[in-house]
Amino acid sequence: MAALRALCGFRGVAAQVLRPGAGVRLPIQPSRGVRQWQPDVEWAQQFGGAVMYPSKETAHWKPPPWNDVDPPKDTIVKNMTLNFGPQHPAAHGVLRLVMELSGEMVRKCDPHIGLLHRGTEKLIEYKTYLQALPYFDRLDYVSMMCNEQAYSLAVEKLLNIRPPPRAQWIRVLFGEITRLLNHIMAVTTHALDLGAMTPFFWLFEEREKMFEFYERVSGARMHAAYIRPGGVHQDLPLGLMDDIYQFSKNFSLRLDELEELLTNNRIWRNRTIDIGVVTAEEALNYGFSGVMLRGSGIQWDLRKTQPYDVYDQVEFDVPVGSRGDCYDRYLCRVEEMRQSLRIIAQCLNKMPPGEIKVDDAKVSPPKRAEMKTSMESLIHHFKLYTEGYQVPPGATYTAIEAPKGEFGVYLVSDGSSRPYRCKIKAPGFAHLAGLDKMSKGHMLADVVAIIGTQDIVFGEVDR
C-alpha cells in the first residue's frame, strides 16, 4: 500500500487511486488499520451533468423480445448442385453432368466430357493409312462399319480411286445393317431408361443375328475392319445373302411388336411428348445432324443430298418430325429402320458380280493364290503391310450419314504413307452441347429421356 501511495504522489490519509475500468478517481479511507476505498461526496460529484435522452432516430427501435429469442432472419435459398454420373446407368458411358436444380426443376445442365479421351487423332498420325483403320471401329463403337466407310472414302478421294461396283453395294448393305444395329441400341436403351424393359430383350436377340453377319464376313463381331480403302476386305461367303434376306423379312415383324409396345403406350407418350423440344432454327444453330435435325422438321440426309457409294441407285424415304421432341425422334428412328430394310432388299436384288477390291497392286493387297506363283505379288504384299502406300499431298473433308448424324473425316496428306492430320467430326459432340438448352425447365427425370433420345456414344465424343 505504501508503494501505491508513493505511486500516486500522496502521503495523506486519503490517497486517490483509479478504479479499474471506470476511469474515475476513488478515495482511499482508513478502516480498522486497513486502507480501502469508499465512495464519498467528492467522488459522487464527478457524475453530475447532462442526462442523455433517446433521440428521434432511435425512438422507433423495438425492445428485445421478452423471452430473449431473436426473430428468424430471412434465409437465402440457393439452388442445389447435383452431380449426375459418370457411373449412372443412364449416362450411356462416362457422361458427367453438373446440374443446378430448383427443387426437381433443372435450371442449368453443364456436361463434363473427356473421361474417355484416348488421343485417337494423334495416334492415327503415327500409323499407316491401313493401320489407322481399326481406330475408327472404336470411335462410335455401336456403328462400326459406318466409321470405316467415312475414312475409306476420304482416303479414296485423296488417292483418286473408286472401288468396284460390287464393293460399293456391299458397303451400302452393311452400312444399313449397321444402322439397324445402332437404332436398336438407341431405341431400346432409351425405353429401358424410362422403365420399359421388354423391347430391350426382344430386339437384342435380333441384334445378335446381325453380329453373326459381321462375324461371317470379317471374323469379328464388333470391330470388323472390313470396309477398307479400295473396297472391302473379302467377298461375301456363300449363303450369307440368303440369311440376310430371311432376317430382313422377319425383322419387320419385330418392329411391329416394338411399336405395339411403345408408340401408343400412355406412359411412353407422357414421358416423351413435349420433352426436349428443339425448333428447326435451334437445331441448325447448334449444328445438329441426323435424327436430331430431321426430328425438328428439316429434311436433310447426306445419302440423298450428297450421295456416296451407290446411294443414288437405291430408293428410300427420309422421315422427318414436326414437333422436335423426344417422341418425334423415336418415330424417326423406327421409320429409318423400316427404310433400311428397303435398302437392304434392293442391295440383295441388285448385287452385281465382280471384284471386291480396286485393281491396283499399289493400294490393295494381292490374292493369296497369286502370292504362291508370282514374286511381284509377294513383294507388293510385303511392302503394303510393312510400309503402306504413299498418298499424294492434299486435303479432303468427307462426310457420310452415320446413324447418329453427319460423321466427317478431315484428312491431310503430306505425300508420305502416314496421315499428316486426321480431324474427326463426331455428330454426338454437337448434340451434347445442346443438352443444356434441351433440359432447361424440365424435371430431373426428363433429363434421362433427353440423354436417351440424343443417342450419345462417348467413344466418338471424346475421341
Swiss-Prot record:
Membrane topology per the record?
Peripheral membrane protein
Modification after translation is described as:
Dimethylation at Arg-118 by NDUFAF7 takes place after NDUFS2 assembles into the complex I, leading to stabilize the early intermediate complex.
Q: How is the cofactor bound?
A: Binds 1 [4Fe-4S] cluster.
GO terms assigned for molecular function? 4 iron, 4 sulfur cluster binding; metal ion binding; NAD binding; NADH dehydrogenase (ubiquinone) activity; oxygen sensor activity; quinone binding; ubiquitin protein ligase binding
* Keyword annotations from UniProtKB, A to Z: 4Fe-4S, Acetylation, Electron transport, Iron, Iron-sulfur, Membrane, Metal-binding, Methylation, Mitochondrion, Mitochondrion inner membrane, NAD, Oxidoreductase, Respiratory chain, Transit peptide, Translocase, Transport, Ubiquinone
Protein task: Core subunit of the mitochondrial membrane respiratory chain NADH dehydrogenase (Complex I) which catalyzes electron transfer from NADH through the respiratory chain, using ubiquinone as an electron acceptor. Essential for the catalytic activity and assembly of complex I. Redox-sensitive, critical component of the oxygen-sensing pathway in the pulmonary vasculature which plays a key role in acute pulmonary oxygen-sensing and hypoxic pulmonary vasoconstriction. Plays an important role in carotid body sensing of hypoxia.
Name of this chain's protein: NADH dehydrogenase [ubiquinone] iron-sulfur protein 2, mitochondrial
